[in-house]
Amino acid sequence: MEHRRLGRLGRENSVLTFGGAALSETTEGNSDRAIQQALDAGVDHFDTAADYGDSELQYGRWMGEIRDRIFLSTKTGLREKDAAKRQIHASLERLRVDNVDLLQLHAVGDLEDLDRASGPDGSLEAAIEAKEEGLVGAIGITGHGNGAPATHLEALRRYPFDTVLTPWNYILSTDEHYRADYEALVEEVKSQDAGLLVIKTISRRNWPEGDPLDGQRYATWYEPFDRQEHVDAAVSWVLSHDEVTGLAMAGDVNLVPMMLEAERRRMTREEAERVLSRAPGYSSPFVSVPF
């Protein structure tokens, strides 16, 4: 498993981050199997969130065994300081740890959300206090939607977040406005030496409506690629960008083996683009969705 430097934090993390959303609504057996598969493949960054159902509890059963050899991150999606502070403490209890390596402000995808989180008595203040108390090692920000890169650029101008997690994939890069926002964010990330993490790598499109034969086969809110060739190409394309520290694995345990295999089966960016440009139904996930 390739490792890359997580910005100024200096930590060399696996390029695949295990996404705890995959554990939100599955059995302990499926959770354990997926976590072990990731560990065996060399994944050492495990991410979750307070909003991911039982994910923190599923992680918590493993922490006694693996905490000292992984980078652990979680998120708070609350915007008010006191509520976020309570949620941070609850997350630590659910994870069965004294601290996490990274706490992220969750789903900050537009300026209204950013204003609430970064304003007086916002969740950013709770995160800063938690860091001062040794409960979290670093502070990051995440978000979905077309406005995420521009919002995260503004966030970095307001506060030196250690990491940014934002959407990036081949189809998003074909939107000139989105690409321009992403490239501006990358410049600021590099200037501040922050870590850049990516989501929506294997998103194919929104789930089709009204077709029972093409229903929601996975727990992801978008329809993912699930042919190995397409997964290989999507992962390869994202990891061909040197600014990307790593990518979050998709939110379904059944996709874990394919993404682990894709990290091993790299193709060039040009090869990946040839495959993805022919992928049927490939479109932005941010169409008619609440982000």
List PLM regions with ranges.
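Short, acidic/polar
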Residues: T26-A38, K81-R96, N146-L156, E229-W237
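Acidic (Asp/Glu)-rich catalytic clusters
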Residues: G7-G10, D40, G60-D68, H89-D98, ...
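Conserved, mostly hydrophobic/aromatic
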Residues: L6, F18, A38, F46, ...
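Beta/alpha (TIM)-barrel catalytic core signal, keyed to glycine-rich beta->alpha loops juxtaposed to Asp/Glu
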Residues: V108-F291
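N-terminal binding-site loop/beta-alpha segment at the start of enzyme catalytic domains
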Residues: M1-I70, A126
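Alpha-helical scaffolding within the catalytic cores
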Residues: M1-R4, E56-Q58, Q87-A90, A148-H152, ...
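Active-site groove signature of glycoside hydrolases
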Residues: L92-D115
